Amino acid sequence: MLKSLIHGAALTELLIEGHNPYARQKLNTETADALRQHIHTPDSLLAYVCGREVLAGSGVFALTQEKFLAYHAATRTVSTVAINQIRQAQAVRGKYGHTVRIHTESRTYAMYGADKSLAGAMHQALLARGITSSFEDKSPRGTLWSAYSGSHPSVDDCLLDARQRLLAA
């Protein structure tokens, strides 16, 4: 109950407005440290999205030049898939923000509550790597969230910060 009162505005934004206020954020230290273990020079980050994994809690999907990484915050683990094993990707506006699905040869990774702009950046990065990707360019259902959500860093700021932090030793 107390968490509902503390995070009430965020829950309203997510459930009613269809916008996840935590979706466009810079990577936290724990996530950056976990992803860094799987990214080695000359590989580099192309894009990432933050959101909620289906039945698994919060997470991050990251795309590098060589692989797709899924960071699972609940278990603090990273799943890796070679980029040539990705069959297709989708980013569609769902009930709680954008839903990103990455279909690989062995399974489908799904995340909801992703930021539209970060999902768009991932879509562009996948297309540039020759992977079939679709992107639904629709905004959240409501627009009231922008009045009380506060400012968010730009997509370019998020990606630049993540690239610098993932290269740090």
What are these regions (language model features)?
Residues 1-61, 103:
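Anionic N-terminal interaction surfaces
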Residues 2-7, 118-169:
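Terminal and domain-flanking low-complexity segments
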Residues 48-105:
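Phosphoinositide-binding peripheral membrane targeting modules
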Residues 103-125:
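Canonical phosphoinositide-binding patch of PH/PH-like domains
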